[in-house]
Amino acid sequence: MPFKSDREYRNLAEGFTPQEEGKVVTGYATTFDQPYKLYSDGAYEVWEVVDRNAFNQTDMSDVIMQYDHEGRVFARTKNNTLSLRSDEHGLLINADLGGTEIGRQLYEEIQGGYTDKMSFGFTVRGDEWKDETIDGVQRSTRTIKDIGKLYDVSAVSIPANDSTSISVRSLTDGVIERLKAERLERERVEALEQRKAALRERINNGRTDED
């Protein structure tokens, strides 16, 4: 599956569902205000959440539906065979696959359960980060506030795990390194303060290391 370095990719929050009328499939590209985990190693976690207003200014003028993010186009917004709209739950996708033979074949694969996973490619124009410690685990949560452009939604044969995909790793690696550096600095400062406190106690008790 080819990934373009200037885009981010995520598995769809919920798989596509074939509709009984026509060759139409529907599903949610993402859900709003529902954090999901991108990375965890027991000591550090990276979470992400999409703000419900993230798509308000998104360029969705020519979004296409593909297979594995490459090759033939099965549906697209420009010819009204692909539509996307935000509702209370998330970004809803509706794709009419009846226009071409390969589209109808993909519909049959989705209907038969042979292909049931999807992912989408996008760019982020604005986000915010929040760091906190929960039960001894350092967590950094990214809130996506503004998605700049949505490029494609794709049926995928073997979906990349969000925690190991290239686009997610490029995001989380830097966050984990920062969290580790901040933890080391806190531990260094805490150790220094403990040594200072111990020295003050010895001085207050009239003793020094030379006693």
Q: Each PLM stretch: what is its role?
A:
Residues 178-211:
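Terminal short linear interaction segments
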Residues 1-180:
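Signature of dsDNA virion morphogenesis modules
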